[in-house]
């Protein structure tokens, strides 16, 4: 009997999901992306060779794995083509192993233009989007005016729908934001040029996954971004435009939620955030510099410097609740090597002196709190590349144990370096 496993981020993204997905896909027949778009950046290092994927599931580097892009993903045809060509140049076969839902909303040039125009108009109140059109594409979906992959297969109807939606968005671009309009004819021509190619990879994803389940195949669902960026449960409005939590699997792929067997929450040994938004445990000192430099904390998609801080247990409790996490994968433990002390945020203190162990429901609430920190001894020994729990110093083991105690959730996998081999699996999610 097969197992259906979800791998998702528990923080603000950049937790190391790509590596863990790649590692676990050795046991999977299907890997499914169910939300987000090419704003994701999943970095995989295999025998020292680095690959960064934004749209195609990380399982593509495993020869026997079928990769699926579900209906919850907003798909930019140009970004998809760029990624396919990059992989083919590296000798990775793609077309025969990539399957796409016809219900995926399309990201088109006017979405990117709107995204950039809006961020510019916000000035110092910018959210920090990637400028890749993700939000505007989801907005069109919710407004029921969006174009989907399947629309490309009827050229006449697509042209009609495109003209209508572009008239609306170009009016906003020119009259409200004072920007140039996006050319309709060019957009139409470029979109239709890829229609037949996309059609060759399209399938009924819901039916495919249900048959795979009945056949006893292992399925892995690959999340993008992180729990604290969820459109409903994150630090709103400093969030992404999709449901990054486990509930997004069902809506973004059509796979029944009762069939999920294990939810693996990727948790970095510290915390980072890229772009704007509240961050109670942020470190703007030499320790923050240490974490950022040693952890090579630069966004895989934008190249932006990430903001580092201590691990926030309060926020992680919310992530456990929302996702019903079965077990954690703790990543980048080695980045803490050499610190005399390590700290965990175990509460939020408000101006009146009260302490809460529950996260606020919006960004404004975070601005009032200061972190209540629990200090633990650090370790001088190197954990980099450790592949056995016996190789970890006692202080590191105590740190891991304390995380498990506070979150009432086991750490089942530990990552001690970027390569897929630099990992210890204590409990196999597929077992």
Swiss-Prot record:
Cofactor needs: Mg(2+)
Positions contributing to IMP binding: 14-17, 39-42, 130, 144, 225, 240, 304
GO terms classed as biological process: 'de novo' AMP biosynthetic process; IMP metabolic process
Keywords: Cytoplasm, GTP-binding, Ligase, Magnesium, Metal-binding, Nucleotide-binding, Purine biosynthesis
Residues given in the record as substrate binding sites: 300-306
Record PANTHER family: ADENYLOSUCCINATE SYNTHETASE (PTHR11846:SF0)
Protein name per UniProt: Adenylosuccinate synthetase
């Amino acid at each position: 009997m097969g197992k259906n496993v979800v791998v998702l981020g528990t923080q603000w993204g950049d937790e190391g999901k790509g590596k863990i997905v790649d590692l676990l896909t050795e046991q999977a027949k299907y890997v499914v992306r169910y939300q987000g778009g090419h704003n994701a950046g999943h970095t995989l290092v295999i025998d020292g060779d680095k690959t960064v994927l934004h749209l195609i599931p990380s399982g593509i580097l495993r020869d026997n794995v079928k990769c699926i892009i579900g209906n919850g993903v907003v798909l930019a045809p140009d970004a998809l083509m760029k990624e396919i060509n990059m992989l083919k140049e590296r000798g990775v076969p793609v077309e025969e192993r990539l399957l796409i839902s016809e219900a995926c909303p399309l990201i088109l040039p006017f979405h990117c233009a709107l995204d950039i125009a809006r961020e510019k108009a916000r000035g110092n109140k910018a959210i920090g989007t990637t400028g890749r059109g993700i939000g505007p594409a989801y907005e069109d979906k919710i407004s029921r005016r969006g174009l989907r992959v399947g629309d490309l297969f009827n050229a006449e109807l697509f042209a009609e729908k495109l003209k209508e939606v572009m008239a609306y968005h170009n009016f906003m671009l020119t009259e409200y934001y004072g920007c140039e309009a996006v050319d309709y004819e060019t957009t139409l021509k470029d979109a239709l040029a890829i229609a037949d190619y996309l059609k060759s990879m399209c399938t009924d994803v819901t039916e495919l996954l249900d048959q795979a389940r009945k056949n006893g195949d292992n399925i892995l669902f690959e999340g993008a971004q992180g729990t604290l960026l969820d459109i409903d449960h994150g630090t709103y409005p400093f969030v992404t435009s999709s449901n990054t939590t486990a509930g997004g699997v069902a809506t973004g792929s059509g796979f029944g939620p009762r069939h999920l067997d294990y939810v693996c929450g990727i948790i970095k040994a510290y915390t980072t955030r890229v772009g704007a938004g509240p961050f109670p445990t942020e470190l703007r000192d030499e320790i923050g510099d240490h974490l950022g430099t040693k952890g090579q904390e630069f966004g895989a998609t934008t190249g932006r410097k990430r903001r580092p801080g201590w691990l926030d247990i309060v926020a992680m409790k919310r992530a456990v609740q929302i996702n019903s996490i079965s077990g954690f994968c703790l990543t980048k433990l080695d980045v803490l090597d050499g610190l005399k002390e390590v700290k965990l945020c175990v509460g939020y203190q408000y101006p009146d002196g009260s302490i809460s162990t529950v996260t606020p429901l919006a960004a404004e609430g975070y601005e009032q709190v200061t972190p209540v920190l629990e200090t633990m001894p650090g370790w001088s020994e190197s954990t980099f590349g450790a592949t056995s729990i016996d190789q970890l110093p006692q202080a590191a083991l105590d740190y891991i144990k304390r995380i498990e105690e506070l979150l009432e959730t086991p750490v089942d996998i530990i990552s001690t370096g970027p390569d897929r081999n630099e990992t210890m699996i204590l409990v196999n999610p597929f077992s």
